[in-house]
Amino acid sequence: MKPVIALVGRPNVGKSTLFNRLTRSRDALVADIPGLTRDRHYGEGRVGDRPFIAIDTGGFEPVAKEGIVAEMAKQTRQAVVEADVVIFIVDGRLGLAPQDRVIADYLRKTGRRILLAVNKAEGMRYTAVASDFYELGLGDPAAISAAHGDGVNDLVAEALDLAFAERPELAEAADAHDHGTRIAIVGRPNVGKSTLVNALIGEERVIAFDMPGTTRDAIYVDFERNGKPYTLIDTAGLRKRGKVFEAIEKFSVVKTLQSIADANVVVLILDAQQDISDQDAHIAGFIVESGRALVIGVNKWDGLTGHARDRIKHDMERKLQFLSFANVHYISAKERTGIGALMKSVDAAYAAAMVKLPTPKLTRVLMEAVEYQQPRRAGVSRPKLRYAHQGGSNPPIVVIHGNALSNIPETYRRFLEGRFREAFQLKGTPLRIEFRTNKNPYAQSND
């Protein structure tokens, strides 16, 4: 089990910059905007041969009573509960702030091991940096620069020493970490993605706030359901330009697309109370282009009239007909209805994406399809399909060999896809078909 280090501090002291350095990633969005990190955000890091999990938190304001600031404070408190060691980050350039004292008072009461890190200390004498912060009563401050890396490795090494001293059992299996099936939950803003995550894992792990754009970053959550391991990827909602900060918008879209590429199965969440938009179709198109297994969840289904339900079904058939391979579930994430069936489809889609297709059966299905309907003649000769084998998985790829296959019509490719899907029960995954024309051994060479 890997030790857990939580990064805590008031807004804009450099928590996300330190998180990104520790995890060698750009997983946490970084910009000079207080409150940018709103959820607990997890990443993996390593110092020497010792791996650990880092938690980036939103700006901590313990006395906040309402609104999203209070939700961020709640997330930070949960991160502290999960952590073996807390690194409390303060700003060396701005000096000690009243809010730092409030946070220090809270942390002392938690019983967690606390390390005090004075960030943005590059170019400053240690005595000048540390003097202000001794009064917090948290021991000797560590002077660091998260942006440049100064002092960071020593700080984390000390945190790990504390963690292993506190819990020796951590050393027994530090590298054991089974992520299970990776599920990306994607969709436009405010369709219920975070509510679905919370329903699946049974705790308020991701803020589900009635405000579009609350979840700005991709968040990875390991959990088990019926004894099976999964990792949920809750992504920033894709949205039209102009509704959020431009820099964040561009990066969030990229993060969502990267999360789709990182997943085994994508759950596309649609809002039953809104029409299917071009944006929904674009997200769906990227999922298919990425070759990812897919399950569709139509959320907020409870309370809709029969007419409204018929309307959304017709809208889906018209605008998302290219997703006919995916199972559709009508759910209420808030009321937690339909989620069990959706997860069964996730398992089935993953199994279909990873299926092994024996060459003899593939070839037999191909020959039966050709016998039922031959491809149309193209030019002088009719295409001759000879045999098929599997060329890959996730998604499954069927490679068909033969002669004169360069002009196989798209309609015939779809016909073959349907035959293969039916024969192997491939529901929930895209299926790729590649045609390869055999070289004629009697053709004369120009050499």
Curated annotation (Swiss-Prot):
Coiled-coil ranges from the UniProt annotation = none
Q: Which domain of life is it from?
A: Bacteria
Matching InterPro entries, A to Z?
AAA+_ATPase (IPR003593), G_ENGA (IPR031166), GTP-bd (IPR006073), GTPase_Der (IPR016484), KH_dom-like (IPR032859), KH_dom-like_a/b (IPR015946), P-loop_NTPase (IPR027417), Small_GTP-bd (IPR005225)
GO MF terms on file?
A: ATP hydrolysis activity; GTP binding; ribosome binding
Q: Where does GTP 1 bind?
A: 9-16, 56-60, 119-122
The answer, when asked if GTP-binding is one of the entry's keywords, is yes
Q: Residues in domain KH-like?
A: 355-439
Please report the stretch or stretches of sequence annotated as the EngA-type G domain.
3-167, 181-354
Q: Provide this UniProt record's keywords sorted from A to Z.
A: GTP-binding, Nucleotide-binding, Repeat, Ribosome biogenesis
Signal peptide coordinates? none
What is a biological process (GO) this protein takes part in? Answer: ribosome biogenesis
SUPFAM superfamilies (alphabetical)? P-loop containing nucleoside triphosphate hydrolases
Q: Which CDD domains match?
A: EngA1 (cd01894), EngA2 (cd01895)
One Pfam annotation, family name?
Answer: KH_dom-like
Provide the binding site for GTP 2.
Answer: 187-194, 234-238, 299-302
Q: Which family does it belong to?
A: Belongs to the TRAFAC class TrmE-Era-EngA-EngB-Septin-like GTPase superfamily. EngA (Der) GTPase family.
Entry-linked PANTHER family: GTPASE DER
**Quaternary structure and partners:** Associates with the 50S ribosomal subunit.
The UniProt function text for this chain reads: GTPase that plays an essential role in the late steps of ribosome biogenesis.
Q: What is this protein called?
A: GTPase Der
